[in-house]
């Protein structure tokens, strides 16, 4: 039987994969993907713990995170499209070209 430890290990591994993607990548789109992987790893952990302690708070919090992540993707992809139209690149290094 798959227990709480298995879910938490998978959650931790997914979070580490997302964190490694955030630290290694220079592409904005891949940074968004890494962020989504990290958020989904947190959701798996919340849902596993809430199922283990028989409390729905973790599941409700995971649903809230999914809603926030959806709005983040909508706004973020719009900004990425504008970024690509202006700089013809999705590299973070072109961020230095912005003046404000």
UniProtKB/Swiss-Prot annotation:
- Enzyme class name: translocase
Q: How does it sit in the membrane?
A: Multi-pass membrane protein
Q: What is its main location?
A: membrane
Gene Ontology CC entries for this record: NADH dehydrogenase complex; plasma membrane
Q: Kindly list the biological process annotations in GO that this record carries.
A: ATP synthesis coupled electron transport
Q: Name one Pfam family in it.
A: Oxidored_q2
Q: Sorted alphabetically, which InterPro entries does this protein's record hold?
A: NADH_UbQ_OxRdtase_chain4L/K, NUOK/Mnh_C1-like
Cite the EC number.
Answer: 7.1.1.-
Tell me the domain of life: Bacteria
Q: What does it do?
A: NDH-1 shuttles electrons from NADH, via FMN and iron-sulfur (Fe-S) centers, to quinones in the respiratory chain. The immediate electron acceptor for the enzyme in this species is believed to be ubiquinone. Couples the redox reaction to proton translocation (for every two electrons transferred, four hydrogen ions are translocated across the cytoplasmic membrane), and thus conserves the redox energy in a proton gradient.
What family classification does the UniProt entry report for this protein? Belongs to the complex I subunit 4L family.
From the Swiss-Prot or TrEMBL record, give the protein name. NADH-quinone oxidoreductase subunit K
Q: Which organism is it from?
A: Helicobacter acinonychis (strain Sheeba)
- What lineage does the source organism belong to? Bacteria, Pseudomonadati, Campylobacterota, Epsilonproteobacteria, Campylobacterales
Gene name, please? Answer: nuoK
């Amino acid at each position: 039987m798959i227990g709480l430890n298995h879910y938490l290990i998978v959650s931790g591994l997914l979070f580490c994969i997302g964190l490694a993607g955030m630290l290694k990548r220079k592409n904005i789109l891949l940074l968004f993907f890494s962020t989504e992987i990290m958020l989904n790893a947190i959701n798996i952990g919340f849902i596993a713990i809430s199922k283990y302690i028989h409390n729905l708070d973790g599941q409700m919090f995971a649903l809230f995170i999914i809603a926030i992540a959806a709005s983040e993707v909508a706004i973020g992809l719009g900004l990425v499209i504008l970024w690509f139209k202006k700089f013809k690149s999705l590299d973070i290094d072109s961020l230095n070209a912005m003046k404000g």
